[in-house]
Curated annotation (Swiss-Prot):
GO terms for cellular component: extracellular space. Pfam families: Interferon (PF00143). Disulfide bonds join C32-C129, C61-C155, C68-C168. The lineage of its organism: Eukaryota, Metazoa, Chordata, Craniata, Vertebrata. The gene is IFNA3. CDD domains: IFab. This is Interferon type A3.
Length: 193
């Protein structure tokens, strides 16, 4: 006669579940660890590429009245996930505007391609990090921040169109883009140290 199998002890299930949960959390945490070394150099290297790509325009430009102001105090956060989402959003907008076929002739196209590749790769890394952190946290990103950033970049696009993508209009956008790279530096530096 066969001996009936003893029922699995509930504590055994708990240990198995805890082991699986810890493994999932370790995998999720490591998904964002690869960003730390990149954060240290991404903004600096991107700014350098940007300077090489888009030198300051030598001609004097009339003062443009671009009403594309941005209150950068809303970017202040110590929440790493929010900083990552904000950085991701900014980079997507920068990529869109800098990949325009109407960039000025004096911009170095190979440097521009290098910068766009760098932005694209970093954005992909952020997406992986955000996808994995979404399994742990459902913290909502402030909608007004997303809309404010979107409105600002929409204003820059309109400004370029209204000024027929002139070199002077691009000079204004160049200055704005430089400021955005500095914002990204502050976002990534303040939340990952």
């Amino acid at each position: 006669m066969a001996v009936p199998a003893s029922p699995q002890h509930p504590r055994g299930y708990g240990i198995l579940l805890l082991t699986l949960l810890l493994k999932a959390l370790a995998t999720t945490a490591s998904a964002c660890n690869h960003l730390r070394p990149q954060d240290a150099t991404f903004s600096h290297d991107s700014l350098q590429l940007f300077r090489d790509m888009a030198p300051t325009l030598l001609q004097l430009c009339p003062q443009h009245n671009a009403s594309c102001s941005f209150n950068d105090t809303i970017l202040d956060t110590s929440n790493t996930r929010q900083a990552d989402k904000t950085t991701h959003d900014i980079l997507q907008h920068l990529f869109k505007i800098l990949s325009s076929p109407s960039t000025p002739a004096h911009w170095n196209d190979s440097q521009r391609q290098s910068l766009l590749n760098r932005i694209h790769r970093y954005t992909q890394h952020l997406e992986q990090c955000l996808d994995s952190s979404d399994t742990r946290s459902r913290t909502r990103w402030p909608r007004n921040l997303h809309l404010t950033i979107k409105k600002h970049f929409s204003c820059l696009h309109t400004f370029l169109q209204d000024n027929d993508y002139s070199a002077c209009a691009w000079e204004h956008v160049r200055l704005q883009a430089r400021a955005w790279f500095l914002h990204i530096h502050n976002l990534t530096g303040n939340t990952r140290t």
